[in-house]
Curated annotation (Swiss-Prot):
InterPro entries: ATP_synth_f6_mt (IPR008387), ATP_synth_f6_sf_mt (IPR036204). This is ATP synthase-coupling factor 6, mitochondrial. Keywords: CF(0), Hydrogen ion transport, Ion transport, Membrane, Mitochondrion, Mitochondrion inner membrane, Transit peptide, Transport. GO terms for molecular function: proton transmembrane transporter activity. One of its GO terms (cellular component) is mitochondrion. Its main location: mitochondrion. The keyword Transport applies. One of its GO terms (biological process) is proton motive force-driven ATP synthesis. Gene3D superfamilies: Mitochondrial ATP synthase-coupling factor 6 (1.10.246.110). It is found in: Mitochondrion; Mitochondrion inner membrane. F-type ATPases have 2 components, CF(1) - the catalytic core - and CF(0) - the membrane proton channel. CF(0) seems to have nine subunits: a, b, c, d, e, f, g, F6 and 8 (or A6L). The gene is ATPsynCF6.
Length: 106
């Protein structure tokens, strides 16, 4: 009985290992065809270019257009010039104290 359950467990493990190999194989970064190799090369190249935190493959016209758009958005939404317009706003909602007897806000 014990040996049969062990054999059954081994079969399940072998099946799972075979299924999961298809998921793990791309993570090994070994390309099986030229197109996959080109894709991996482009991903690595993009990662290196975007490490500085700036736009990838930008020119002065694109950077000027980005600055113009950020200035327009800042003017439209009333930015004080110190607020980072690329960051999601933080909302603060104060807790309302409720009187437990009358259930009315104070």
């Amino acid at each position: 009985m014990l040996s049969q359950s062990l054999l059954s467990g081994m079969r399940v493990l072998r099946t799972e290992a075979r299924r999961n190999f298809g998921i793990v194989a791309p993570a090994l970064n070994k390309a099986s065809d030229p197109i996959q190799q080109l894709f991996l090369d482009k991903v690595r190249e993009y990662k290196q270019k975007s490490a500085g935190g700036k736009l990838v493959d930008s020119n002065p016209d694109i950077e000027r257009e980005l600055k113009t758009e950020l200035d327009r958005v800042a003017k439209q939404f009333g930015s004080d010039g110190k607020t980072d317009m690329l960051k999601f706003p933080e909302f603060q909602f104060p807790d309302v104290k409720v009187d437990p007897i009358t259930q009315a806000p104070q």
